[in-house]
Amino acid sequence: MLSVLTVPAFNDNYLWIIHDGVHAAVVDPGDATPILAALEEHQLSLVAILLTHHHADHVGGVAKLLQHFNVPVFAPRKDPIANVSHPLDDGDTVHIPELDLHLSVLAVPGHTLGHIAYVAAEQGWLFCGDTLFAGGCGRLFEGTPTQMLTSLEKLAALPDDTKVYCAHEYTISNLRFALAAEPDNAALAIRFKAEQAKREADIPTVPSTIGLEKSTNPFLRAREPAIADQLIAAGRVNENDKGPVAVFAALRAWKNDFR
């Protein structure tokens, strides 16, 4: 039986350990120290490293982990990452035999051009790095709005009960923005209160689910007329150009400046 262990790091990162009680794979180990501590605490042996993109808070711990464990490193072929043994492209599959874990690889460019996500279909898990967040999405550091929207809609096509293991605890700030973008969304208002209660109790808001994101995350709702209307009223989208890409681009630009 596989499970996912949450390992907080830095100010708001989540590193993920997939394990069976004996063996473990780590997703996006930006810092080796908390990973090594968690492996020791739970008496786990590392057998694989999985990376979603090249940013330092996701790959910074790889070299140190490799000093302790001689394991394969899976990562996107199109992102510049050191120490990669298994470069991956869209449609590839990863098998970690020690865990009997099968992962499908999805190319999700936008945050970075080579960003990938891993889907464990049997378990219903998605490890999406900085592409999809609980209530939000990653900044477009390298990609275009069209690329990011396509990537997000690819993730939104996964089953609604898929658990979303994103890499940051940004949920409350994301949902504050979501309420500005779609103030009449009743499901969103309910979610905001529930997530606030979790944070007040120091409980992670991640994982989310695809179904919850589809009903409350504005970046998965760029085709909703209510959001387009809100952007038009705010002068952020032209009435004559309110297609989903224009709406998504306006949402992302607004979020970048939202306080």
UniProtKB/Swiss-Prot annotation:
One of its GO terms (biological process) is methylglyoxal catabolic process to D-lactate via S-lactoyl-glutathione. The keyword Metal-binding applies. CDD domains: hydroxyacylglutathione_hydrolase_MBL-fold. It catalyses: an S-(2-hydroxyacyl)glutathione + H2O = a 2-hydroxy carboxylate + glutathione + H(+). Keywords: Hydrolase, Metal-binding, Zinc. InterPro entries: Clx_II_MBL, Glyoxalase_II_hydrolase, HAGH_C, Hydroxyacylglutathione_Hdrlase, Metallo-B-lactamas, RibonucZ/Hydroxyglut_hydro. The keyword Nucleotide-binding does not apply. Transmembrane segments: none annotated. Monomer. Thiolesterase that catalyzes the hydrolysis of S-D-lactoyl-glutathione to form glutathione and D-lactic acid. This is Hydroxyacylglutathione hydrolase. It comes from Herminiimonas arsenicoxydans. The gene is gloB.
